[in-house]
């Protein structure tokens, strides 16, 4: 039973994640250290490298034992909740929830079928989306403005992303009635797929997570502010102290019916008793929490780990996350601990980013003219150095990643075709925003493997945060998302000293024309980060 040895069970579930990626990290970091030693001809300098306390080369990406793992969880800031979703060799889905205030909760969620209908449905939606994008050559962009019939206008000066992607040059011409009908059909199909994805996400939560869905959320209360409530609840003797604490922490997020379902799930998880808890008892517990608890006002985060074969699913858009939408992904908890170690024991999160120390690469292939036009207007608000329409050299990329605090790429894919192995050879200081189709998609290679992704190279290079796309979207849509994210980061500049990147992403997602098909494709891996607002905008001095 998971409740009998919670720390041991949690240790094994968490330790099982991303073994191949962690081995790659060990190999690359050792290679960096070896290269650093060989490049220093001075014997004393070589010995200094060997004796260095730099955690990067010596980090082994594993936990020594259960006690080591427990000590790391207990050192987490209270605003951080770590949730590990794992898939065992029998295709059973498990959730492991860890927080510094209580012992872990391990829940057996569901057994996935060999050809699971949910995964099949997601593949169907993405295949239809890809097909609609590829067929959309020379389709004008839809405007937010309405015509006299209440329908969206079609913009003549917008062109379709795949025409640019395939390097096809078509003569400029005014849209004909046939073109406008094609555009109407195209955007009708995109909106239909967006609605399908919305329904799918709700079904995903219901069928795979069920009553356990609230466990994805961080605490809504601070325990030190609610000690009297905990004491009163302990006197009832219905639940264990960890379970009572968890029920208190999540009460303010969910309806009473959802809370009762969660209570029963947790009780079944910690006892083999088939006796139901009296409804009056549950109502009394709920009343004590409702009347006596104090809800916290601070922003909290969920660090979410999912296996590679499930990484293409839009977990961040599950309905339950509407209550606390700040979600950061990780390949494994080891990567979070590695990034924190490299930041010399981060005392507070989010990590602050100086927006004035930025660099961008825009349309290096030179074939995304409309994207270049749109984004040039956007970056023109800032005093950022960058490259437009030209391929950066490896030295330029290396300097951008090491000396800047924000790196923005807008082009095809992740940009890896241009700088190859440069990222893995660098110690990356810059939060990296990769706005290209499938830029941080993890390509599944089967059970027991961690897949392939440019994402891994950035995280191994100690990139604090990587933002990118999980699947294909049109250039116009993702350009709009990038613009909305920038606008959200600037909002309330007179009243807020910092702005969460994750908060800006959430709001940009909601303001998308296609909040699921486009908005849900953008996710963030790594540490929570925030921009210093007074440093982000160009100063007129």
List each language-model region with its residue ranges:
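Domain-scale, conserved, charged regions that form catalytic cores
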Residues: 2-347, 353-360, 371-383
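Structural motif
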Residues: 303-305, 405-410, 431-435, 466-468
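Short acidic, S/G/P-rich loop/turn micro-motifs used as interaction or catalytic elements
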Residues: 309-313, 364-370, 412-417, 438-442, ...
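Short, conserved loop/helix-junction motifs that constitute active-site signature segments
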Residues: 351-353, 422-429, 461
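Functional beta-strand-loop-alpha-helix junction segments that form "active/interaction loops"
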Residues: 360-425
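Caspase-like cysteine protease fold
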Residues: 417-423, 476, 480-541
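Charged helix-capping and loop-helix junction motifs
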Residues: 421-425, 447-457, 483
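Short acidic/histidine-rich active-site segments
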Residues: 464-477
